[in-house]
């Protein structure tokens, strides 16, 4: 295991070679920082992508364990999360990396099946509770605020086997049970809670295209054994939204007054730019938002689905009962978590027929997502085929959310740059990640601009601290500030780690918050 002294030597060498390059890349023309002293700068992770130890100390099988083992061909490199970054055994080393970066927060998630191997149909795994207690305590000891997500795509396989997980209202009970246990055991120290990560993205991949477990879909969206892409995504989303409200109800009525924390939800966002100035394309861009991020955020904030969805889907969209609407309005989020990576052009498919593609169907809002407008790209393409670099779209997205949701506090819970490891890619090339630095620099400048516009943003978490298991990409796409050798699990800081460290130092003085 790498020692702290080795980290110090590596960062010293980078600091001698890198400062001139770094200083040229960031800072807008206005060098004043809009970040207040209590702003959270951190990195983000998730349990399945990081922990490994997939059957260690009483952990049960989860949906991703089963999916990756039974369908290795669905993962680009045929890999799984059995070991991942092995953070379960190496979290102290990773906390040293965070501490050296100067971050004052770390976003992590709870492995549902590590705490409750069989959901509410089995016993609590107190070895799992102990692991998270140790991790939380170690973070706090170093002055790093834990920002904890209750559910980040993974759940006990038992719940899929019993009642098809998110397709059943029973899942709301199980999620409430998990939330109660986590608040009880960790809430005296955890003051920032996220209920569910990216319900919109999770549902689209699991129940529309069938690319994520439980791999349910129908033609023409995907080729699955079971599922209905026209109806099941909306059923699953309905249950996730109500499970979110259930968790907040438990926190508000049993824990928040004493524990004095806050709780919210995370959605995936993309900026949707109309491909022309026509009214049809402008309306389509708004529909695209309604069928993507607003699908989740409108019920969470206003207790109802967006009008565009109601008008277009009719009876295919579940309805909230009066009691459910009351619950949503009574137990609102304290903040919104915003994950953001890219932008798209949007072409209307409601009035004018257009080619099939992402967004073009009725269940997706009849708003086709495109990355080009004639010969003009929405932004430079990264190694990840869905990610284009468009910092101005990020600024527009934050202002859109500010205006639509009355400037409720926001945290940028994920933002990062993906780099593909090709057969010819060298470790040296991965460590000298200048494209990632340019991406982060542009998006953080856009964040500054949005905050000067008045967006009420309270924190920023780079995705990700480490290279990790990136779902369908396996270990072939790297988002980390630290390189991971997945044979030895050695962590090595990339140039972007030094850049992010310098950015934090230059924008917020948080040294008094960190126990060096």
Curated annotation (Swiss-Prot):
Look up the EC number in the record and give it: 3.2.1.21
Any stretches that span the bilayer, and where are they? none
Q: Which UniProt keywords apply?
A: Disulfide bond, Glycoprotein, Glycosidase, Hydrolase, Signal
* Residues carrying a glycan: 223, 375
> In the UniProt entry, which residues are flagged as the active site?
198, 414
Alphabetized GO MF terms: beta-glucosidase activity; coniferin beta-glucosidase activity
Cross-referenced Pfam families? Glyco_hydro_1
Show the catalytic activity: Hydrolysis of terminal, non-reducing beta-D-glucosyl residues with release of beta-D-glucose
What is one Gene Ontology biological process annotated in the Swiss-Prot or TrEMBL record? lignin biosynthetic process
User: Listed disulfide bonds for this chain?
Assistant: 217-224, 349-354
The signal sequence is 1-22
Where a beta-D-glucoside is bound, by residue?
A: 49, 152, 197-198, 341, 414, 463, 470-471, 479
Question: PROSITE patterns, alphabetically?
Answer: GLYCOSYL_HYDROL_F1_1, GLYCOSYL_HYDROL_F1_2
Q: What class of enzyme is it?
A: hydrolase
| Tissues expressed in | Expressed in roots and stems.
Q: Which domain of life is it from?
A: Eukaryota
Its annotated function is as follows: Hydrolyzes p-nitrophenyl beta-D-glucoside, p-nitrophenyl beta-D-galactoside and natural glucosides such as salicin, p-coumaryl alcohol glucoside, phenyl-beta-D-glucoside, coniferin, syringin and arbutin. May be involved in lignification by hydrolyzing monolignol glucosides.
Give the UniProt family note: Belongs to the glycosyl hydrolase 1 family.
Q: What is the designated name of this protein? A: Beta-glucosidase 46
Look up and give the organism this protein is from. Answer: Arabidopsis thaliana (Mouse-ear cress)
């Amino acid at each position: 295991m790498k020692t702290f002294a080795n980290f110090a030597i590596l960062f010293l060498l980078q600091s001698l070679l890198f400062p001139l390059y770094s200083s040229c890349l960031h800072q807008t023309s206005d060098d004043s920082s809009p970040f207040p002293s209590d702003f959270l700068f951190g990195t983000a992770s998730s349990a399945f992508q990081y922990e490994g130890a997939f059957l260690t100390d009483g952990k049960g099988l989860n949906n991703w364990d089963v999916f990756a083992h039974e369908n290795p061909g669905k993962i680009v490199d045929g890999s799984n999360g059995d070991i991942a970054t092995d953070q379960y055994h190496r979290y102290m080393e990773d906390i040293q990396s965070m501490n050296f970066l100067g971050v004052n927060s770390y976003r992590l998630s709870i492995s549902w099946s590590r705490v409750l191997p069989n959901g509410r149909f089995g016993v609590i795994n107190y070895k799992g509770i102990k692991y998270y207690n140790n991790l939380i305590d170690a973070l706090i000891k170093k002055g790093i605020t834990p920002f904890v997500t209750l559910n980040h795509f993974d759940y006990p396989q038992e719940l899929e086997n019993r009642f098809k997980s998110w397709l059943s209202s029973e899942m709301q009970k199980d999620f409430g049970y998990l939330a109660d246990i986590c608040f009880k055991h960790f809430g005296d120290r955890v003051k920032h809670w996220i209920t569910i990560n990216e319900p919109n993205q999770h549902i689209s991949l699991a129940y529309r295209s069938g690319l994520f477990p439980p791999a349910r879909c129908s033609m023409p969206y995907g080729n699955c054994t079971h599922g209905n892409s026209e109806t099941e995504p909306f059923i699953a989303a309905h249950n996730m939204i109500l499970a979110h409200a259930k968790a907040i109800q438990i926190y508000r009525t049993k824990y928040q007054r004493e524990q004095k924390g806050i709780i919210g939800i995370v959605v995936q966002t993309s900026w949707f730019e109309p491909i022309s100035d026509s009214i049809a394309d402008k309306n389509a861009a708004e529909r695209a938002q309604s069928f993507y991020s607003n699908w989740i955020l409108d019920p969470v904030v206003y207790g109802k689905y967006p009008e565009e969805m109601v008008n277009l889907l009719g009876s295919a969209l579940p309805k909230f009962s009066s009691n459910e609407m009351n619950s949503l309005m009574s137990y609102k989020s304290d903040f919104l978590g915003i994950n953001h990576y890219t932008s798209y052009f949007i072409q209307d498919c409601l009035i004018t027929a257009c080619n099939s593609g992402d967004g073009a169907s009725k269940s997706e809002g009849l708003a086709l997502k495109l990355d080009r407008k004639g010969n003009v790209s929405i932004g430079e393409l990264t190694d990840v085929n869905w990610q284009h670099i468009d910092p101005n779209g990020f600024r527009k997205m934050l202002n859109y959310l500010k205006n639509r949701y009355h400037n409720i506090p926001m945290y940028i819970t994920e933002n990062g740059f993906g780099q593909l490891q090709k057969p010819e890619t060298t470790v040296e090339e991965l460590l000298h990640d200048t494209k990632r630095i340019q991406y982060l620099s542009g998006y953080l400048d856009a964040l500054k601009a949005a905050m000067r516009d008045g967006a009420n943003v309270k924190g920023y978490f780079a995705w990700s601290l480490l290279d990790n298991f990136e779902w369908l990409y396996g270990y072939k796409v790297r988002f980390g500030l630290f390189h991971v050798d997945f044979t030895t699990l050695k962590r090595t800081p990339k140039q972007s780690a030094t850049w992010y460290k310098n950015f934090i130092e230059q924008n917020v003085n948080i040294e008094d918050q960190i126990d060096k």
